[in-house]
Amino acid sequence: MIDKNTSYVLEQGDFNRPATGRPVVYGTNGVISSGHYLTSMAGMRILLDGGNAFDALVASTFAASVTEPTASYSLGAESTFMLYCAESGEIKALSGQGTAAAMSTPQFFKSKGHYSIPTGPGLDAPLSFTVPGVVAACFSVLEKYGTMTVMDVLTPSIEYAEHGIPNYEYMLDRLKAGKSVSQFERFPPGGLEIFFNNGSVPEPGSLLVQSALGGILRKMADAAVSMGDNRLKGIAVARDCFYRGEIADLIGVASNRVGGVLTKSDLENYQAKYSEPVSTTYLGYTVYGQSTWTQGPVCLQALNILEHFDLKRLGHNTPQYIHTVTEALKLAFADREAFYGDPDFVPVPVDGLLSKDYAAARAKLINPVEAAPGLPEYGDPWRYSSATGSVAPQPTYSIGGSPDLQQESGTTHISVVDQAGNMACATPSGGAFDKS
């Protein structure tokens, strides 16, 4: 129970510490957090109109494709979801990750002179195209857990795209990067005409209108409206509009034009996929995450390792505390680089990676006074896995880290809780500028 004094400190700030300007915020309809205030506003509009957390999450995920195009992601991207239904107590992971194109085989890349998959930016970036999974996943959430129509959840993003949003500093900083300009020049049309003002970076606060994106969103919404009051049929035809109709045709043609591997057939065969989340326990809490088709288990592995340290005794954010947490994360990331992959396609010792005994062995590697240079050696989770008898794949990780670890840019995230206790979150990513 929080007493009156504690409540005051939470709301006004502890006067014995520097003020943060971030008091506790209370609400009655729900809470939403995202990477941009207009993304959050899209979801809050849905909550105030009577929608649930899942409706709001879908609305905000579509809105983020308009409000954060240079920052994080686009409709040509992917997303992972974690969903908790208060009524049933069900927790589900949902993959909106794009699968590889049918053309993307080792033999194909070798025939092009590549012994690893080339990623963007660059002339060979189209060879790394995957199926855009985020749209299918959003409609899957709306279909299974939502209450509102396609038009309801797409209206905020349509308005943002057609009427414009204010340009903001982070997005403009990305536009100033030479690789953004070169990518637009390499893959016309669209980028330079939409995001630049006669070749110059716009001023903060100027209007960014994305009419073509608005047209795609409106086309899906209108397709759903054509089904009348049948909400589920509306969702199905909106999904087909993107993956089987004119939009899929345009994506296939555009991919072919730039030498990409993605075809309309790849889109037609795509399905977002639900799965059971993986989990671990930490100090009495059960913590859930997606499996190794994401990097979600990194957090769970790190928590398992950190159970072997008295973080409270070390003191929050003391040098020793930060050192210990950092080293635990590095051990988990080393395993990520070596063993993570989609269990549907490659053998992964998921149970071994999340084994408490394995974590105990890894925890012993942390030197209390010295940081490991770069990433440490990956471990041997196969020893702790029920699949030990399987042939363990040879890790492709090299000591010293991968280029991905040097990236400064990240992605975006959306979390929603409604008044019924439903909780939903999404991490849409990729398909935007130098990430594509």
Please state what every model-predicted region is.
Residues 2-41, 45, 53-237, 242-294, ...:
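Noncatalytic scaffold domains of N-terminal-nucleophile
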Residues 9-12, 199, 248, 252, ...:
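Internal maturation/activation junctions in enzymes
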Residues 87, 100, 293-295, 308, ...:
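Short loop/turn segments at secondary-structure transitions that flank enzyme active sites
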Residues 104, 432-436:
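A short, polar/charged loop-to-alpha-helix boundary motif
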Residues 143-148, 224-226, 306-313, 336-341:
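Short helix-capping/linker segments at secondary-structure and domain boundaries
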Residues 289-297, 402, 417:
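Extended C-terminal regions of large enzymes
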